[in-house]
């Protein structure tokens, strides 16, 4: 589920910043590929017990997420605050969420 403005996805009641929609499909896919490679590298480093490689792979994950717009400075320019990782019912989206079918699925 995305917020009406498309800035966040909601997973288990928590807001997670969505990727920057201004990225081209090609840019976005290249960054997602880099992110997934970095995540696999984190797992491989952990399994190998290689703390140096794990730290480097985690830095690659962070860089990819910043480039996607999911971390770092917000990608919108209207001055709205970043509500990443907030519970949706504790955010400015609470009224919308409570009135939506997603908040109270029957």
Where are these regions (language model features)?
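Extended, charge-rich alpha-helical interface modules
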Residues: 1-106
């Amino acid at each position: 589920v995305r917020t009406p403005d498309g800035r966040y996805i909601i997973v288990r009641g928590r807001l997670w910043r969505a990727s920057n929609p201004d990225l081209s499909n090609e840019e976005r896919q290249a960054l997602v590929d880099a992110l997934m490679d970095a995540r696999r590298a984190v797992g491989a480093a952990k399994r190998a017990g290689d703390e140096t490689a794990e730290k480097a792979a985690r830095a690659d994950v962070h860089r990819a997420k910043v480039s996607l717009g999911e971390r770092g400075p917000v990608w919108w320019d209207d001055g709205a605050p970043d509500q990443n990782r907030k519970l949706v019912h504790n955010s400015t989206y609470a009224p919308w969420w409570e009135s939506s079918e997603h908040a109270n699925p029957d």
